[in-house]
Regions:
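A short SAM/SAH-binding and catalytic strip from SAM-dependent methyltransferases
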Residues: 84-95
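S-adenosyl-L-methionine-dependent methyltransferase catalytic module, highlighting the catalytic core
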Residues: 98-103, 110-197
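Class I SAM-dependent methyltransferase "Motif I" SAM/SAH-binding loop
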Residues: 27-29
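Alpha-helix C-terminal capping/helix-to-coil transition sites in glycosyltransferase folds
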Residues: 19, 80-81, 107
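Short conserved loop adjoining the S-adenosyl-L-methionine
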Residues: 73-79
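Conserved alpha-helix/loop element of class I SAM-dependent methyltransferases that forms part
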Residues: 4-20
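Class I SAM-dependent methyltransferase SAM/SAH-binding core
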Residues: 32, 36-73
Length: 197
């Protein structure tokens, strides 16, 4: 992966996953995260992807992948089947985020979600200037975006409380650096680790 394509959320996720863990990567895209985890942490994992091109790319990357629409649920997987269920920069494209989080909590001991923080100051400034934000974490124009549910760090904390998820760790980053001061304002990417209460 080139430096311009580096996914800092992948680095953080990798630091949370122990060797040999059972991992389900929802919306796995080309399988880069899962392939990396298999190589470095020897995880046993599966990817779930709806896009046929993503499925083919995942297979080419050596990832076991299932073509499935996350909106229909994860009935193919039993309760507690995985140690970790990951949803990386996909939450904002889900129609029913509450249901998806509930399914993550059902099939996994822990969940990890990453998403672009809509509360980031540059996004707020773009809106104040009269247009929707376009950035590294929100790379689409308003008219061609798959993102339908944008949220802030605080919004996601509230959703976790609503669905009965206990937040174990949360990090907000900008340009690969953790933001500790006013993270909802100064961080452009949020990474949460949680489990069922």
């Amino acid at each position: 992966m080139s430096p311009s394509q580096q996914r800092y959320d992948f680095e953080l996720i990798s630091s949370w996953i122990p060797e040999g863990a059972r991992v389900l990567d929802l919306g796995c895209g080309d399988g880069t995260l899962l392939a990396g985890l298999a190589a470095t942490q020897r995880v046993v994992g599966y990817g779930v992807e709806i896009d046929p091109a993503g499925v083919l790319a995942s297979v080419a990357n050596g990832v076991d992948v299932i073509q499935l629409d996350l909106e229909t649920g994860l009935s193919a997987f039993g309760d507690g089947a995985f140690d970790f269920v990951i949803l990386s920069q996909t939450l904002q494209a889900m129609k029913n985020t509450e249901k998806v989080l509930g399914e993550m909590l059902r099939v996994g001991r822990e969940g990890i979600v990453t998403f672009p923080n809509f509360g980031y100051w540059k996004h707020r400034l773009d809106i104040a200037m009269g247009h929707m934000p376009v950035s590294k974490t929100l790379p689409y124009q308003w008219y061609d975006t798959p993102n339908i549910h944008l949220c802030t760090v605080k919004d996601f904390e509230d959703l976790c409380a609503k669905v009965g998820a206990q937040i174990l760790d949360e990090r907000v980053i900008t340009g690969g650096h953790q933001v500790n001061f006013m993270p909802n304002l100064l961080g452009d990417l949020a990474v949460f680790r949680f489990k069922r209460k």
